[in-house]
């Protein structure tokens, strides 16, 4: 039975544009001390496009070494061979409660290519892996969202443990999640508590943290609360969410973590700096 939880995505911090992991180490300890049970690195929040492969390993290791809980480590979107090498290299620091999350790196042409990519990563890891499932461009034009058929096939061949769900259409996402095997760990992303509130009855059991990156105890209360508490909290969450989206989710998150003196004290170019007025808001 998959467990009900929130998952905190970890952003990197820098000093003079070099990766620094000291604040990351302290940040994940703070998360654990305040009730977080699972953390994750992922292409977006963890800024894989701004990090070298070596730095992604350094970020991942700082989390595994200092977080006393479950760690889901993102694998950068790259060739199948390089992705397999990446997960094999995690052997130097992974623990019993460490997992990896694959990301298909290119356009969609056919499901078999995706299944082979994830299956080979699973084989290199030595067990089922997670899969990041964002919308992707089709090689023949247009876009493609992951289907329950593809995800279930990976699960039934023991290659898949769970997914980071990012279906581009909220109403269609309900049918997508409802069609998944009920033993798949489904981590809802984008919209956080509100999206999870909608998709839980379809079978989602977890969600990517929002306000929990700053105050994890709030999301623990949400998971343990009755519907009435969430309704009373909804107005505050909406204000928080709208303010973050006004300036961009990831930029706002990094700024808030800095203001709370938790991590993300500096950025790496190219990355925008929020104005003093934006940070005050």
Residue spans of the language-model regions?
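Catalytic alpha/beta core domains of metabolic enzymes, predominantly
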Residues: 124-128, 134-247
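Active-site beta->alpha loop and helix N-cap motifs at the rims of alpha/beta catalytic domains
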Residues: 2-145
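Alpha-helical scaffold segments in soluble metabolic enzymes
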Residues: 62, 120, 153, 221, ...
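Short, flexible micro-motifs
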Residues: 46-47, 80, 165, 213, ...
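C-terminal alpha-helical cap/extension of soluble enzyme domains
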Residues: 8-14, 30-36, 204-206, 211-281
């Amino acid at each position: 039975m998959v467990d009900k939880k929130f998952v905190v995505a970890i952003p990197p911090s820098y000093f003079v544009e070099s990766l620094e992991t000291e604040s990351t180490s302290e940040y994940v300890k703070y998360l654990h001390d305040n009730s977080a049970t699972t953390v994750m690195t992922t292409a977006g929040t963890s800024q894989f496009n701004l990090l070298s492969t070596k730095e992604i390993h350094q970020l991942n290791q700082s989390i595994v070494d200092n977080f006393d809980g479950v760690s889901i480590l993102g694998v950068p979107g790259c060739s199948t061979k390089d992705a397999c090498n990446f997960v094999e290299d995690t052997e130097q620091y992974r623990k019993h409660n460490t997992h990896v999350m694959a990301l298909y790196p290119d356009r969609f042409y056919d499901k078999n290519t995706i299944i082979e990519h994830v299956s080979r990563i699973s084989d290199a890891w030595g067990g089922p892996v997670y899969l990041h499932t964002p919308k992707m461009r089709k090689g023949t034009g247009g876009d493609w969202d992951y289907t329950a058929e593809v995800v279930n096939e990976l699960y039934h061949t023991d290659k898949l443990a769970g997914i980071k769900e990012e279906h581009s259409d909220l109403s269609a996402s309900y049918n997508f999640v409802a069609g998944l095997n009920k033993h798949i760990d489904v981590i809802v992303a984008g919209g956080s508590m509100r999206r999870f509130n909608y998709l839980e009855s379809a079978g989602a059991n977890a969600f990517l943290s929002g306000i929990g990156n700053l105050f994890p105890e709030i999301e623990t209360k949400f998971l343990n609360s009755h519907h009435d508490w969430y309704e009373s909290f909804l107005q505050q969450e909406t204000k928080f969410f709208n303010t973050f989206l006004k300036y961009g989710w990831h930029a706002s998150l990094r700024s808030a973590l800095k203001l709370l003196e938790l991590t993300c004290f500096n950025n790496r170019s190219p990355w925008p700096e929020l104005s003093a007025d934006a940070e005050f808001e």
